Amino acid sequence: MDVMNAFDSQAEDSPTSLGRSLRRRPLARKKLSEMVEEELEQMIRRHEFGEGEQLPSERELMAFFNVGRPSVREALAALKRKGLVQINNGERARVSRPSADTIISELSGMAKDFLTHPGGIAHFEQLRLFFESSLVRYAAEHATDEQIALLTKALEINSQSLDDNALFIRSDVEFHRVLAEIPGNPIFMAIHVALLDWLIAARPSVPDRELHEHNNLSYQQHIVIVDAIRQRDPDKADRALQTHLNSVSATWHALGKKSQKMR
């Protein structure tokens, strides 16, 4: 295959009617690194390079595409971000398969930007409510005894962290992570981890003393959720979860307003 033909394309003459209806403007030219990236991606997706197989060396890729080393390195870095290759120091890039974490990380920048828009946090809180509502209903119907034991252990750690806000936040995240693990779906896990990371990062900074009562309430609400799961009652578990997340949202909105007034 003559790869370079795609890199030397000529612009076609525009129809006269198009020229009359549109103002002339230059077409954006693709960078060489983007062209190399696209071609390598297509090769990988066509299985010309299999999973776990090493790509040609940088020097070989430079010669093959007739480009410089920076273009090759930029292309490989872009493929790494997409999860299509792994790059270890001193080794040639190796073809890999994108994971759920890779997919979510590609969305992370856009998600964090959206959170800064008016209503952005509320939209993500609603997404979390819909998502975890399904998780808790599934847990009430399908969680194994071992998985319920893990939830119980997470509750114990929760209770031991009430007087330390940083520890409580970690134990709170861990409790919800155990809940998200129950279906055994790696995409659920990746979404859940990212969603909590985005929401926690968007929360205002408040003194620890402001959170002690909130932490106690969250812990008590976690107990109700686990009890409903133990009872195999999805409706009760769902109600408990919604009460908990609505309470969390209300608390942080109130703390955020209070923090703004104090500035």
Curated annotation (Swiss-Prot):
Keywords: DNA-binding, Repressor, Transcription, Transcription regulation. Residues 1-25 are annotated as: Disordered. Residues 30-98 form the HTH gntR-type domain. One of its GO terms (biological process) is negative regulation of DNA-templated transcription. GO terms for molecular function: DNA binding; DNA-binding transcription factor activity. Coiled coil: none annotated. Transcriptional repressor that controls expression of the genes required for the catabolism of sialic acids. Belongs to the NanR family. HAMAP family: HTH_NanR. This is HTH-type transcriptional repressor NanR. The gene is nanR.
